[in-house]
Each structure stands twice: as C-alpha cells, then as structure tokens.
Regions:
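Non-transmembrane, aqueous-exposed alpha-helical and coiled segments at domain scale
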Residues: 1-452
Length: 452
C-alpha cells in the first residue's frame, strides 16, 4: 500500500469548520439535564444495567445519609481482599479468579484443575499466525497490534457465525488463553523490527500460570523469581474486573447488544481501553513521576514536593491539564481497595529490588497529592490513589517495557469483558440505544448557486 496522501492544508480548514459548526453551548447540557459522561455532578454513574459479576462499595448509609467510606471491591460476592488473602503463599490466582468471574463460583480443586487444563490446551495460536500476522506487520502501538490480532483470529474460526452460548463461551476462553502470547509476541516484533532490538519467541509452558508464562515469554533467559510472578499475578487479579460501567466493559455490553461476534466485541473493548483516560493512565503516572523528579531538587523535601504538585494541579507544570494522575476515581471515594491491597505487594517487590527510595517517593506523592487537591479544588468526594498509581511502578520493577503496560491491563481485563459479554447474552436481548437531544436549528435548502 502506498503512502497516505498529504492533505494537511485541507485538514486544517476542515477542522476549523468542524470546530465552528459543532460547538454546543455548555449551558444546554444543564438545561436539558444531560448527564455528561453518563455521570451526575457528584460523579455517580447513570444506572444503565444490572450485573451479578462485581460490585464497588464507595459509600454507605449512616443515619439515612449517603456517606463516603473506604472502598470495597467484590467479585461474585467475595471481597477481593479475602480472595487474595486466601491465595497468599499457596498458589497463583489468575486461573482461579478467572473461573470465579466467568462461571460464577469459586472452583473446587478438581474444577480448577479442569479449567486450568482447558486454558492450557487453548494456549496456542493457529499455524504460522505469529509469522504471518504479528511479525509481518509490527506496530509501535501494541494495543493496535493486539486489536488487529484479535480481529484476524476470527478468520481462523469456522464457528465465528455460530451465536450459541456454548460457542461464545469457547471463544472467550480461547481469547483469555492467548492474550498473553499476543501481547508479548507483539512486543518482540516491535522491538526487533522497529526498535533495533533482539527478538526471541518462547512458547508458553503448560505447567506455568498466566503470570509465570508472561515473565518467561518476555525475558531472554526465561528466568523469574517466585515473588516477581506472585506480584504480577496479584496485579492481573486486581485488574480483571471493575464493574459494568467502566468504559471498556460498557463498550463490551454495547457492542454485544448489537449481536456482534466475540472477536469484534473484544476488539472494540481493546479500542476503548487504549485511551489514555482509561487503560493508559499508568503510563501517565510514570511520566508525571519522572517530571516531578526532574523538577524537584530534593524529593524528600515535602515543602518543595507540595509546591510542585500544586503547580501540576494549577496547570502550570507537567502536561498542563491540572491532573495528578493515579489520584481519584470515577467510582471509588475514600480509597480504591485495589490500591490498598496492592501497596503491600509493591513494597515487598521494591525492597527485594533495592528500590526502597523509589517506593518512598511514591508514598510521599500518595500522601501529599490529596491534600494539595483538596486545598485547591472543590471536590464532591474524597481523593485517593487508584490502582494505576502503583501498577506502572510494578511493571517497571519487573522489567516490563512501557509499550506493554496497557496490553498487560488487557491481558487481565479480557476476563471481565468475557464475563460481562456472557451475562449480557444470557439476560438481555435488546440493543443498547440511549437518546441524544438535538438542539440544531432547521434551515431552508439553499441551491448551489446561492451558497456563497
């Protein structure tokens, strides 16, 4: 295919026309009661559906008053904290929690063995897929690579047009199984062809968990420590699911409701997750932390740290958007339970890696940023760290390249997407179609010669 035609001049003009004609008076949104972002002024989401997969508790009723509380995240009725505590030092949790989210119950030993064996059997790509699809079209944007791979897999599936629930379940399980390979192999192709790096393709090993296989496929020597694998496993578990209203999961529901096939649905969810306001947040955290280090002469000086964080909030520093990335969440209020649980594992890994000073730096920002935000902004609820604040730091300590940060999120969240797709198919047979209020003025048709 040839190069795209250069239309920079025309595009500039078209953009100016678009901005002029598309601008809507912001007051109209309030006048018509529009919930922008499908959220009210307090940040609460518009009720769009019912789910039995997960729940986030950010508020509780006290004397009849809705009051912010420390967050709790429930997977199929189980507190995520209890799920992780039950795994501590015993086994990896990705497969067990995937079973729980997808099928609704915690597996017994035999059920877990059968499910894990099923994932292992599906952990294979079609013949020459890596060569013909991943290697021949490497991309620096690994989310694009991942999305393309998912859509291409549909052409290898003879049952793609079969709408039975059993076929949808089979396709979901297969995608959950191969996502680690698609992500890691996509990175190796990029690193070799576009980054002048080395390339090595390690096959997944059947006796290893998802977290272990991710590390051994990514690293040239295939070596990792139990702590590294365990912390990555916890990271995957905490990113698997976060309710039906997050952007990519709601996208899953919307596209599923149209009757689209599994591959198209998951590709749409990936496209949503790719956005920096969603799956790319941990990259922004890392960039922000690097910026703070570069502009604060002594990161142990809390007055200097507080002053620079204030500049970020005032849009005078970093990307001038006024956001302290990794702080706050659309649903959680006083705390993100994922961040609370994750922090102890982050600390363990930091100590093992000789990164205590870096952990202390993150801890300082975590403590000071909410104070600065509260001083400078009118906020409707508490501000606390979310799971994105620490996940990029963990990936960095594990030697995972930044290009893989969002794909790692996808490796975990495809489990939640699959669970929500199945729940939508089981319970709903109506396309999602919200309303938009038109505020355009009607005009009389103008013949060509009268248009000026």
């Amino acid at each position: 295919m040839g190069e795209y035609a250069a239309i920079e001049k025309e595009a500039k003009l078209f953009t100016e026309l678009c901005v002029h004609n598309d601008a809507i008076d912001p007051n109209l949104f309030d006048e018509f009661g529009v919930k922008r972002g499908l959220r009210d002024k307090d940040g609460n989401g518009v009720l769009a559906g019912i789910t039995n997969i997960s729940r986030i508790d950010a508020f509780e009723m006290r004397d009849g008053v809705k009051t912010p509380c420390d967050g709790k995240l429930w997977y199929r009725g189980y507190n995520v904290y209890d799920l992780i505590r039950g795994l501590r030092g015993k086994r990896y949790g990705f497969e067990e929690v995937a079973y729980l989210l997808l099928l609704g119950d915690l597996p017994n030993e035999q059920q877990l063995h059968e499910f894990t064996d099923c994932l292992t059997k599906c952990r294979a790509l079609p013949s020459n897929f890596v060569r013909d699809v991943i290697m021949k079209a490497p991309s620096k944007d690994l989310m694009n690579s991942l999305t393309r791979s998912v859509l291409t897999l549909a052409s290898y599936d003879d049952s793609v047009g079969d709408n039975s629930l059993q076929t949808q379940m089979e396709q979901c399980i297969k995608l959950i199984s191969v996502f680690p390979m698609l992500a890691v192999y996509g990175y190796h192709a990029y690193n070799y062809y576009l980054n002048d790096g080395s390339m090595y393709i390690h096959r997944p090993r059947p006796e290893l968990s998802a977290a272990e296989n991710l590390l051994q496929m990514l690293r040239p020597d295939q070596q990792y420590t139990p702590l590294e694998a365990h912390v990555l496993d916890i990271a995957l578990l905490l990113h698997m699911e976060h309710g039906g209203g997050n952007n990519s999961t709601f996208t899953t529901r919307v596209v599923t409701s149209s009757g689209a096939d599994t591959y198209s649905v998951i590709a749409a969810a990936l496209s949503s997750l790719k956005g920096p306001k969603h799956g790319g947040a941990n990259i922004k955290v890392m960039e922000m932390m690097d910026d703070i280090r570069a502009h604060v002469s002594d990161v142990t000086d809390e007055d200097e740290m507080r002053a620079y964080i204030g500049k970020i909030v005032d849009k005078e520093a970093f990307d001038h958007k006024g956001l302290v990335y990794g702080m706050g969440h659309a649903v959680d209020s006083l705390s993100d339970p994922r961040a609370v649980v994750f922090k102890s594992f982050v600390q363990q890994l930091a100590m093992a890696k000789g990164r205590k000073a870096d952990f202390d730096f993150y801890n300082t920002v975590e403590r000071l940023a909410p104070q600065v935000i509260a001083e400078k902004r009118h906020i409707y609820k508490g501000v606390s760290t979310n799971v994105d604040f620490y996940s990029g730091f963990v990936y960095n300590m594990l030697g995972i390249p930044v290009e893989l940060y969002t794909p790692m999120f996808a490796v975990a969240r495809v489990v939640g997407w699959s669970a929500h797709r199945m729940e939508e198919l089981v319970n709903v047979d109506k396309i999602i179609r919200p309303a938009y209020k038109s505020v355009m003025a009607t005009r009389d048709y103008l013949p060509m010669e009268n248009r000026g």
